[in-house]
Amino acid sequence: MKLSLAPISLDRYFDTDKDMRTILELTRDCGFTYIDYDIKQKYLDGDYIEIAERLKKNLTELGITAAQAHAPIINPFNPGEVDYMDAYRKSLHFCQIVGIPRIVIHAGCLPDNTKEEFMANNIAFYRSMIPFMEETGVEILLENIGHYADSYYLRNGAELRELIDALDHPMFGACWDVGHANLYNKKDCEQYSSVVALGDKLKALHVHDNCGYFEKSYRHHRIDMHTIPYVSLYASVNYDALMQGLVDIGYQGTFNFETNAPVPPVRFSFEYEGEIVRKLEKLPIPLWKQMNVLLYDIGKFMLETYGLFEG
């Protein structure tokens, strides 16, 4: 199994369009030759074809493979001013140009919708994209998202598989988000059984860690942290359960990290003598590289332990 990285933490260092090659070079320097490419809405609002062609050229020259992509996150049932169908059509075309075989497109929800309403609405939504999917040849992956405060019903592998099966089209598959799954109580979501339930529909992973689910009386809050495995005292994803599931289903995709370290996405501001101080807001790039070299080594250890690592 190949290791992969979604280099989203570099969004805070660089212009993801103008500095595209630099981002790819840094990712490769950490050991990763497979990536999960994040398609920005700003690309789709401009000359996205030129950006896609340039990305393809850079990937080829640098020896990097984009095994999967992520579309802009838009709630199709409350899209605001965004034309979500146009955004998703362009996202699929973007992938077609670059040669990315599959893309994650999130489901949507309405406040307090029932499970039946959630399923019916999303079946109609995803089926509306079948013509674009067939035209481009790019698979659409559904991802498990949400937590107990939301009205999403993709809490575990069985529910995700239920929606995919209802779509009844061979080009729909699953992206299992390991960290999202960890936000639920184990009785509602468990890594091994979820991966097994997805079976041959599982095409991609988002691997990251968090503090998981705690009862409301506990001192920690649930939060989608996207941290590196093993670095937090309360990190609680059971990677043995995940890995055994991948082994048992013969998973063929990449082991893709979607970590947002070492850049903190949220930080209270500090003002001193009338100026906002940001000296320690983020690590310098050499330290970013060291941390993500460590991430690669952690992934290699995990895969080698289960006999899955492909150099």
Regions found by a protein language model. Give the residues of each.
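Histidine-acidic metal/acid-base catalytic patches
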Residues: M1-P7, F14-G31, T60, G99, ...
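Active-site-proximal loop/turn and secondary-structure-junction residues that shape catalytic pockets
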Residues: S9-D11, I39-Q41, P72-N75, A107-P111, ...
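N-terminal substrate-binding region of glycoside hydrolase catalytic domains
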Residues: L26, G31-G46, H70-I73
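Residue-level detector of anion-binding/catalytic polar loops
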Residues: T33-Y34, T65, P101, E139, ...
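Conserved beta-strand positions in the central sheet of alpha/beta enzyme cores
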Residues: D36, Q68, V104, L141, ...
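Glycine-rich, proline-tolerant flexible connector loops at the mouths of alpha/beta enzymes
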Residues: D36-L59, N113
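Active-site acidic/histidine proton-transfer and metal-coordination neighborhood
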Residues: N58-E61, F77-A174, L183, K279-K282, ...
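The substrate-binding groove and active-site-proximal loops of carbohydrate-active enzymes
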Residues: I73-E81, E116, H226-L233
